Amino acid sequence: MAARQKAQEVGVVPIGNGGGAALHFLASVLQARNIVEVGTGTGVSGLWLLRGMTEGGVLTSVDLEAEHQRLAREAFSEAGFAPQRFRLIAGSALDVLPRLTDAGYDLVFLDGDKVEYSEYFDEAIRLVRPGGVIVFDNALWHDRVADPAQRDPETSAIRDALKKVGDDDRLRSVLLPVGDGLLAAQLIG
């Protein structure tokens, strides 16, 4: 996959095949028409999501790095996806997400700055429709999340976000032990 090779060239860690297959499955089961992704990378996870979405579905992907988005645009086009199937927004997720439509998305995939996971969740819960799913990548964070002795900013932030999800009565969630861990949480309703 060209997008995976490009990721290695620019120093981006793409989602693994197991995590990608899980994203494809979720997008397909949800018959997703609208998905938000935080952390475009070079398009690896976006390709999995696009392939699982309904025909004509639109992926909105947010990333700070315009170069990463250029590479993702190339990957999506090379894979045969028409430009109207994806919307790439360069900018901080915390600036972009508040401008997106409430309850307008079937799936929200979070794979951006780990320190901002809790804030991403606050936006995602507003963006996802009832019955939709919020997915956090790196929920195990190299097996550091379960170790209380690990207190670095990323690990602590992921741990806090996962606790927020677990404490929220509006959600039913599951931790999928694929790749570096995917936490999937469905908005009940």
Regions found by a protein language model. Give the residues of each.
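A short alpha-helical cap/connector motif
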Residues: M1-L107, K114-V135, A139-G189
